[in-house]
């Protein structure tokens, strides 16, 4: 065993900023990468399932024509598109924050620019665990349904879906399990960050034929707000932690719903 005592070393960065700033910045970057990986694996799962469902015939027709199968495929596509929309919105926040941060190193930002940088940093911090947590869970669900649509064949190496299923599983584990993403995201539930974003999305223009869907999201947001208020009013940390996953998932579903409407409008 080799031990160094009182050895001189070069300090990388600033003192007492290692865990708070540097490690979390590294972790968030990795989590965003895994969110992107999750979308990629989810896309592969959907394509494999769709291709097989079109080719596989049973009782004289392709199995994609059976309601049980096309319902699964529809849900897979919805989860894929939703997680991709959330990923792109998250990367937009990160890009805007990083751009302003880089500019601030070369020249002094105006007051409005500093406020804007702080806003994008907050949004990036809020959406990163959401994109990783929701994206990786949707990825696992799509990989599961891909195997399910293949039936017994999906368990065999003759088809790619068994490998996709294995590839998907790690996404909800490394760089923080889904449970840890909930821990990172719950403070943005209790402080109102996600609710404020819902209100922001509600104010943006969408196609007239999508208004009924937005109204449903507004109703969901009202329910979400009541639940968050009721849970946080207890001021019981354990009680809040117990319901954290459900509240984070509610926020994720509503936000992704708004993003899908905005993407459809564009």
Show which residues each predicted segment covers.
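C-terminal amphipathic alpha-helical interaction region
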Residues: 192, 203-266
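Internal glycine-rich alpha/beta core junctions
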Residues: 1-226
């Amino acid at each position: 065993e080799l031990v160094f005592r009182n050895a001189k070393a070069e300090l990388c960065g600033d003192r007492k900023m290692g865990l708070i700033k540097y490690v979390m910045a590294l972790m968030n970057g990795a989590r965003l990468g895994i969110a992107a990986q999750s979308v990629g694996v989810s896309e592969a799962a959907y394509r494999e399932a769709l291709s097989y469902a079109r080719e596989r015939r049973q009782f004289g027709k392709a199995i994609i024509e059976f309601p049980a199968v096309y319902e699964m495929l529809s849900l897979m596509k919805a989860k894929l598109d939703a997680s991709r929309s959330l990923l792109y919105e998250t990367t937009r926040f990160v890009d805007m924050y990083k751009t302003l941060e880089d500019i601030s190193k070369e020249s002094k930002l105006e007051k409005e620019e500093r406020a804007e940088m702080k806003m994008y940093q907050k949004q990036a911090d809020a959406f990163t665990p959401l994109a990783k947590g929701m994206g990786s869970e949707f990825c696992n669900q799509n990989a599961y349904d891909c195997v399910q649509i293949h039936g017994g064949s999906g368990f065999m190496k003759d088809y790619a879906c068994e490998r996709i299923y294995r590839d998907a599983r790690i996404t909800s584990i490394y760089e923080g399990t889904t449970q840890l993403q909930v821990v990172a995201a719950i403070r943005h539930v209790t402080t109102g960050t996600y609710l404020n974003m819902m209100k922001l999305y509600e104010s943006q223009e969408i196609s007239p034929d999508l208004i009924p869907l937005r109204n449903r999201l507004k109703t969901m947001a009202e329910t979400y707000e009541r639940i968050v208020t009721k849970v946080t009013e207890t001021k019981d940390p354990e009680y809040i932690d117990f319901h954290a996953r459900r509240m984070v998932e509610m926020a994720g579903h509503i936000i992704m719903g708004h993003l899908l409407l905005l993407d459809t409008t564009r």
